[in-house]
């Protein structure tokens, strides 16, 4: 299965695995799954780390290097951006909306820890 991980799952998998639920850990550890990340996650980490948020202490450059070295990047393309307009107005977080659009356009499952994101239609799994 192809899985797009949200930012929290990426951060926890990279630096705080104890915060992962058993379900999330099982999905990430399953070698039959292809894992992906969105550049929107790096954007979110860079912005929130720059704001000195306690939950975003990971250096986005190091995170990117580790993720890129494993071939996990799902680039943001025009179709993803255009799909955002058709999403329901569940909430306004631009990062979440990009992930939902990417997952929908690509036909892959977005794995998230956010119950608001899980309310969007499409291939989304709350863990």
PLM segments and residue spans:
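Active-site neighborhoods of divalent-metal-dependent phosphate/nucleic-acid chemistry enzymes
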Residues: 57, 61-64, 68-116, 127
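Short, well-structured N-terminal submotif of metal-dependent ribonuclease cores
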Residues: 1-37, 51-65, 106, 115-120, ...
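Generic structural signal for small/hydrophobic residues in well-ordered secondary structure
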Residues: 7-8, 45, 84, 103
């Amino acid at each position: 299965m192809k899985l797009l991980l949200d930012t929290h799952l990426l951060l926890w998998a990279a630096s705080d695995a104890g915060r992962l639920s058993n379900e999330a850990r099982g999905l990430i550890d399953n070698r039959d799954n292809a894992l992906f990340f969105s550049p929107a996650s790096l954007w979110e980490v860079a912005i929130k780390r720059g704001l000195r948020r306690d939950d975003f202490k990971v250096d986005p450059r190091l995170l990117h290097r580790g993720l890129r070295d494993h071939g996990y990047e799902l680039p943001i393309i025009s179709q993803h951006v255009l799909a955002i307009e058709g999403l329901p107005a569940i909430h306004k977080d631009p990062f979440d909306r990009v992930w939902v659009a990417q997952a929908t356009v690509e036909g892959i499952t977005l794995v998230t820890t956010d119950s608001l994101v899980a309310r969007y239609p499409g291939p989304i799994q709350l863990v």
